[in-house]
């Protein structure tokens, strides 16, 4: 398992994160007990491999104490010079508020894409840029709702084996 690392951010523009609900195949933590925020594949809005040290615009994760996310918790994602992977325990439904800025994130989202199609949900600015891929508009705040006890994966590794489809809702924060 990767070492948990959380710390208070010192500011800077937030950028998109790729979020993965931890799966037993990759981590010893049971899938229903943590959200894995995978920062290996996005820097400066561009997918890239791990590790990419000292890349301007690469990101780390901060979380307030207590170090678990419950319903309504805010998980800030800020610019930093190093990559960090963080496993956060979860309870119930988790809403992660991501301030997305600085480019377009082209990442692979394994979920029910039709439910997130702008043609059927005007509150979501998501367009399919390639089969199984989406482009998410930036400079907006998004709410990502994870429903626990269902395998959910946000990933951008082309060779990843996707888990079963699950309920994921992405909505623009109205405030």
Which stretches of residues belong to each language-model region?
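Primarily mature extracellular domains of secreted and cell-surface proteins
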Residues: 30-175
């Amino acid at each position: 398992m990767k070492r948990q690392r959380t710390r208070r951010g010192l500011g800077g523009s937030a950028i998109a994160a790729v979020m993965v609900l931890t799966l037993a195949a990759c981590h010893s933590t049971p899938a229903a007990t943590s959200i894995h925020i995978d920062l290996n594949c996005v820097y400066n809005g561009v997918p890239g491999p791990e590790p990419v040290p000292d890349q301007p615009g690469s990101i780390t994760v901060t979380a307030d104490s207590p170090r678990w996310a419950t319903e309504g918790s805010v998980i800030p994602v800020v610019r930093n010079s190093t990559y960090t992977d963080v496993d956060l325990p979860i309870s119930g439904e988790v809403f992660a508020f991501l301030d997305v800025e600085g480019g377009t994130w082209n990442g692979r989202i394994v979920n029910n894409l039709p439910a997130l199609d702008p043609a059927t949900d005007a509150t979501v600015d998501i367009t399919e840029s390639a089969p199984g891929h989406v482009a998410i508009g930036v400079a907006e705040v998004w709410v990502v709702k994870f429903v626990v006890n269902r395998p959910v994966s946000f990933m951008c590794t082309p060779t990843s084996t996707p888990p079963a489809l699950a309920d994921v809702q992405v909505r623009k924060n109205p405030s």
